[in-house]
Swiss-Prot record:
GO terms for molecular function: structural constituent of ribosome. Keywords: Ribonucleoprotein, Ribosomal protein. This is Large ribosomal subunit protein bL31B. InterPro entries: Ribosomal_bL28/bL31-like_sf, Ribosomal_bL31, Ribosomal_bL31_B, Ribosomal_bL31_sf. The keyword Ribonucleoprotein applies. It comes from Salmonella paratyphi A (strain AKU_12601). GO terms for cellular component: ribonucleoprotein complex; ribosome. HAMAP family: Ribosomal_bL31_2. Part of the 50S ribosomal subunit. The keyword Cell wall biogenesis/degradation does not apply. NCBIfam families: L31 (TIGR00105), PRK01678.1 (NF002462).
Length: 86
């Protein structure tokens, strides 16, 4: 490896603001902010969504209608297809 070209890999605390959860992860992200957890100071980054708050991971998913787009089109505009102009 060449010296002085690789980013510094360190433990960083990511704060999921929507779930108010803190996650310690190894990262090369640059940040000026710091936070103290358990008597140790870590670099600190806020995020809006993580696995602690994303609906896919929490099980609070929206269910979508299984009706096809063609069927929805027919339902909305099907009466125009057979209509006479004039």
């Amino acid at each position: 490896m060449k010296p002085d070209i690789h980013p510094v890999y360190r433990t960083v605390v990511f704060h999921d603001t929507s779930a108010n959860e803190y996650v310690k992860v190894g990262s090369t992200i640059k940040t000026e902010r710091e936070i103290e957890l358990g008597g140790v100071t870590y670099p600190y980054v806020t995020i809006d969504v993580s696995s602690k708050s994303h609906p896919f991971y929490t099980g609070r998913q929206k269910t979508f209608d299984s009706e096809s787009s063609a069927a929805r089109f027919q339902k909305r505009f099907g009466h125009f297809i057979g209509a006479k102009r004039g």
